[in-house]
């Protein structure tokens, strides 16, 4: 046990950055409502950073902050602010001004190629081959998510498609984030804090005991979450 009441440690978190391209709060509010409706499991009440670098017109920051907060998103900071007056308004509200890392120079565009003939659509998959640590949030939009290592407690996996975890699953797994009720979750060692498919969820104490710590497959059957052995 530490002898001091506090301890400072470096850490990193995965946050969504909302780039504002419109200075009208009502327009931003509606655009965010539409976006949240597409992936509520990922975006509802999510902490976000607002990037204001693209705003050229004067901004009513109080109204803008209220418009964003009214959607349920939690603004934890602002980046890309170069206007001194706007920066003062933001800081007056108690929000930190965040400095982003330097952006890499864009790569030259590849030479145009003739379109391939008779191509077959491919379903993309996001692959994570490193451990997912506590505090990390990984989202796979419009595709499946495969993790080949362990997922720590406090980590969160979100996918619009299926989720596969080939390691110990101690965090949270939310498949079908955009509402697809045909998605499934596959784990080789199910010890999750929460599992969810299209909004139907179990907390850890709701996972049947005979499947806890075992290889398991979860899916919806008649709109109810079910689990079976993963053979």
From Swiss-Prot:
Keywords: Cell cycle, Cell division, Septation. Gene3D superfamilies: 2.160.20.70, 3.30.70.260. SUPFAM superfamilies: Cell-division inhibitor MinC, C-terminal domain. Residues 102-125 are annotated as: Disordered. InterPro entries: CAP/MinC_C, MinC, MinC_C_sf, MinC_N, Septum_form_inhib_MinC_C. It comes from the Bacteria. GO terms for biological process: cell morphogenesis; division septum assembly; regulation of cell division; regulation of cell septum assembly. Belongs to the MinC family. Interacts with MinD and FtsZ. Cell division inhibitor that blocks the formation of polar Z ring septums. Rapidly oscillates between the poles of the cell to destabilize FtsZ filaments that have formed before they mature into polar Z rings. Prevents FtsZ polymerization. This is Septum site-determining protein MinC. It comes from Escherichia coli O6:H1 (strain CFT073 / ATCC 700928 / UPEC). The gene is minC.
